[in-house]
Amino acid sequence: DKVIAVTASSCSFPKRELEEAKAFCEKNGICQIIVESEELDIDGFRQNPKNRCYLCKHELFEKIWEIAKENGMNAVAEGSNMDDNGDYRPGLIAVKELGVSSPLRQAELSKAEIRELSKEMGLPTWDKQSFACLSSRFVYGETINEKKLGMVDKAEQLLLDMGFHQVRVRIHGNIARIEVLPGEITKIVEEKNRMKIASKLKEYGFDYVTLDLLGYRTGSMNETLEDKEIKK
């Protein structure tokens, strides 16, 4: 009665994430409300500006605050952690502006520490792969639309179904830049896997399929930003 889980649903989020959240809440007896996140309708969002995440988070948390107040609650919390402090995270500005709590950051917990504590508590999500919305796969300034979001979603699902543990398919025009864990690069370039991935991604709409030799890392689209932009 004291907690409501609010889950966003939109074309920027894979259906698998929504289904996993629903299953978790149902299994643990948590009241869940699913809210439509309509970020593609936000003025300027589709143009993918550098403050894209701010635009989305501000709109989403305004909706969540409305739900909280309708249910007699006076607090809203989100799940960022200390690792998020080291990257460009304009969404955290919206968190601060709207008075949303960040308990994991306030406790100064890193992602690794959260995983360790989750494992000790027996939570099935302790080793869940990191996830960020599909809009974060687009190079800044490239138009975001439903078709390309679908291309990214299908490409990442393919890689997960093939047994890769942490994946990103970054989109540069009609070029796919694949990131997998460094330890899985050897696997992805095996002839059978390489040809299957290239064939499928071209089927999904990509013209070229490339592999990032640095491997998976969070926020790789921010590597082209100047330090002064990141500090804003």
Spans of features found by a protein language model:
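Short, conserved beta-strand edge motifs with alternating hydrophobic and charged residues
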Residues: 76-79, 133-135, 168-170, 179
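ATP-dependent adenylation/nucleotidyltransferase module used to activate substrates
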Residues: 1-120, 161, 176, 192, ...
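A short, flexible beta-alpha/helix-coil linker loop
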Residues: 40, 139-141, 183-185
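Mid-to-C-terminal catalytic subdomains of enzymes
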Residues: 105-109, 115-159, 166-168
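Short, electropositive alpha-helical surface patch
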Residues: 88-95, 142-146, 226-232
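Peripheral terminal appendages
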Residues: 1-4, 153-232
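Residue-level detector of family-conserved "landmark" positions at structurally sensitive sites
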Residues: 6, 35, 78, 128, ...
